[in-house]
Amino acid sequence: MPVYGNKNAFVGLVIELRAIGPVPIIIGQGICGLVGTSNRGPTSEAVPIGMPSTGTRLYHSGDLKEAIELAFQQGCPVIYAVRVLGKGNKKASKKVKDGATTPSEVGTFYAASEGIWGNSVIITIEDGEFKATDVEIFAGDGTAGPYALKVCDIIESPRNYVKVNGIPRTIVYNSGDLGEGKVYVDKVNGTITFYEGEEPTTAQTISVYVKYMTRTVTLTDNEMTETYRNIRDLIDLQARLRTSALANFVPKAGALHLPANSTFALEDGSDGQEIVTDDWEEALYLLGNTIAPTTVAITSYEVEPSSYDLIPVLDGFVTWMANRFQPCIGFVSARENESVANLLDLAAGYNNRLLVIEGNGWDQSNPRKNLAVAHAAKEAAVALGESTALAMNSLNGVRDLLVTFNQDEMDALTRGGINVFMKQRGIKPYVSITTATDWQFMRCVDNRTINWIITALDYVCKQFYHQRRTPEVLTALKASIEGILDEQVILGNVERYHVEVMPNEIDVNRVDVELLVQNIGHIERVRVVFGVGVLPKE
């Protein structure tokens, strides 16, 4: 706590500034994480996607691109995407040089993302439509030069000038014309040279104003073409290509000249080794270390055929996230046309309130849409306490179900921990369940509320670490917890709760909190006693 004033003063003011009272909280919600394969796109980062067109531009085609589009169709406001690619993957690239007499490297073009697709990118550099101006002021060094300018490919212009201490020198563009009172401007190499005997001293200032050619850079992969016109320098080139879907540019340290006109293809791009489960695991943990999503979906269920080897990877990931007080629900679809018996056998190996296995998670679109993605996005999009099994929350953008189950099969699968979809004025979950066997943790809607409370508790408790364990502070801690739960009661997400905050009697640095919460119920069964006959008069 800050202390203001001098405690040693005989007469004076000392102020101890303390934080008191309950803590308000702000918790991010509505974030869906997607992990999958695609033909292109970044592999070393979890990319925030704000609109479907961004996903299409970055990932081009493949499961991840389709998943991003489907997730946005569910009304999910924010999506983070991670592309899975094998180890040893590499971006296609090409080093470029300037147009000087002895060319120097000025930077490297890189494909916008890793993979062999980058080898199809062709780059054309040519003169821009407009001229640019280079203005420089620097001190002489006592020699005639040459003095290197920041630009090359200089244009002869009546507006060009070179001055020494404000006195202009006559510009010549041929070294053989250099003479008294003149300065030679080398248009190709971007240098100036003074006449012998008229060398600027270290006490004199050289002022230069010259016109030079800009560059227009065209990128194409024979499907998409991007053109960037009238680029003035390397920094401008780097900035203009920063959001390109095809290629980026990184200047070489110390380089100043624009690259020479040329046409070339990027090369040496690689997809790396075959994708294995470790690659999916790394992608998931990259997502978890970047953002705390509400839900996560993976676009595939296995790497090795008939193994379902990605489900345990997702199972472990969501458990790890919960252990960090950032719980999220993970969604994965089972194999297309899987039998009821095999689905029940699959679910028997899992008991996790944060894992959802979709029994009939594919539609009839071409390509088929992954309903695990749609379900994850819908769970992230709906309000806390609202079930995605509501008819009004039916999945959007899907075309029928590839497989439908009858009532007995849906009941058996639901009891066995497999979530199933039904077609009834829209395609929606029958109940929307996880693989958990305890009824308290069976439904996704209840787990989203539980996850929100866990995240809120972590946020609140962090505000009280290392504070004095006084009755005042404990009261504020209790009020903070009550504040978040009172709001959920008002919103109809929690029916009632009980909270106690007590100092531990043995450990003076510990506080014990007892929290009991009853989630709001969601009507699934209705029993009617229907009496028929003569009713007694009131």
Q: Regions from the language model: what does each represent?
A:
Residues M1-I137, K150-E198, T202-R468, T475-K478, ...:
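A glycine- and small-residue-enriched flexible loop/hinge signal that marks low-structured segments
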Residues G142-P146:
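Short coil/turn motif common to extracellular beta-sandwich-like domains
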Residues E505-E538:
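C-terminal edge-of-domain segments
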